[in-house]
Amino acid sequence: VKDANLVNSLSGKVAGVTINASSSGVGGASKVVMRGTKGIDQSSNALYVIDGVPMFNLSGEGGQEFDSKGASEAIADINPEDIESMSVLTGAAAAALYGSHAANGAIVITTKKGKEGRLSLTVSQNTEFLRPFVTPKFQNSYGTGDLLSSSGSVERSWGNKLNSSNYMGYDPISDFLRTGVVATETVSLSTGTEKNQTYFSASAVNSVGMVPNNDYDRYNFTFRNTTSFLNDKMTLDVSASYIKQKDQNMVNQGTYSNPLVTAYLFPRGDDWNEVKMYERWDTSRNIYTQYWPQGIDTFTGQNPYWIAYRNLRENNKDRYMLSASLNYKILDWLSVSGRVRVDNSNSTYTEKLYATSNTTLTEGSNNGLYGISTTADKQTYADLMLNINKNFGENFTLQANIGASLSDMQQNVLQNRGPISEDGIPNVFNVFQLDDTKTKRTQSGFHDQTQSLFASVELGYKSTYYLTLTGRSDWPSQLAGPNSTQSAFLYPSVGGSVI
């Protein structure tokens, strides 16, 4: 079954690569670790390289103790149907070509392009159904209460022993979770002549999660054209992609506002059907209020359905990628190439906690909480390389790459988040309703640039013995300050292999 996140398709197929799929569901960030974790407090994730150009896989911040915000990532936006092949690059070769970002290894992705011949139209559809496979085990022998008594707690299940007359038969898997569905449709077109090839694809991913009111939608549009000039000595390759994504209530594990916590711990002696109607009309306030007779007690719990339908978190993202590469073959064994790639995205994240949500989560407000943040990511990469691939006699081969690159990354985040003021209107979500004394208005971001020179030389003998030399020097902007004692760092390597 094809996965909507192309990274997950590598699971179990590459030796030494561990892939942990996201607990947030479709669109969530997956962790890829090659040959073990490299550090305690730093990411061990691999670098992704698409058609020879690094893609710096920025991901959103996950949820915190009182903030359930699932995290997505840039690589999860890519349409798996546009992928021609994937390979894994580790060691000094990865670091020499792509810098310190590839210290944990690199996943090299080659995308599809048009093929010479008749017009080809491909239509594919994939539907996946999701149900829990491994779930926690809970006792169902004792009812609501504590210490074998019906008193002491309204949220625990250590009360009197249940029997056939008072056991409600509650099961969180069948009673709360639903069958998830992931539907993927793709249409692709390929056509070309000997001198010009064109590829176009459009794809839609629509997912309904297992947790109620958790949805994910993504739409991809990709265009690529490859043209040869000057008796096939020069090749121009251009591509453009646009991605529109929306996710709602992406679940984050281990937080108090995760609906699974109270769904799992719901007292076995209580009636689940009673709390399915998660809100009641309050005539004194003229609003619907949360119904959760179990209370908050020790783990800041809420009605799971209230969390799903009245603690709303929505993320909307627009992303476009433009790239171009030009290759000129000077001699049969010598060529020069240049590449440039622009990858920009704009995201808007909104958070709406309705009135009577737990006041620990709404920062003390009985009228609700509202948050909105906008994030703009801009990535630009360019490189120029001299490529050598030459045979010397019958026994010796030489492969070398010598070049320079520039990587520029920017991020700007604007955020407004705070409780609705006590004299405000409940459940009216805009920044004018927020309590000025408690609202957090922040602006953050960064602008990093790295300029590099690199070289990789591999000498082969009889297609059996190989000697590899690599070297790279980076000039990162982080070392450009007046107090820096070093403006660049060099990392060379020497390696050998026998096949």
Where are these regions (language model features)?
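Short, small/polar-rich motifs associated with maturation and membrane association
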Residues: 1-223, 228-229, 234-238, 321, ...
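Surface-exposed loop/interface segments of Gram-negative outer-membrane beta-barrel transport/assembly proteins
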Residues: 23, 42-45, 50, 61, ...
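Extracytoplasmic/periplasmic beta-strand context in beta-sandwich domains
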Residues: 30-32, 105, 400, 488, ...
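Alpha-helical support elements that line or immediately flank enzyme active sites
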Residues: 65-66, 322-328, 342-344
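Extended, hydrophobic alpha-helical segments in both membrane/secreted and soluble proteins
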Residues: 83, 221-223, 338, 382, ...
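Residues on the lipid-exposed face of transmembrane beta-strands in outer-membrane beta-barrel proteins
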Residues: 111, 187-193, 223-227, 324-328, ...
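Repeated loop/turn-to-beta-strand initiation elements of outer-membrane beta-barrel proteins
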Residues: 195-198, 232-236, 333-336, 396, ...
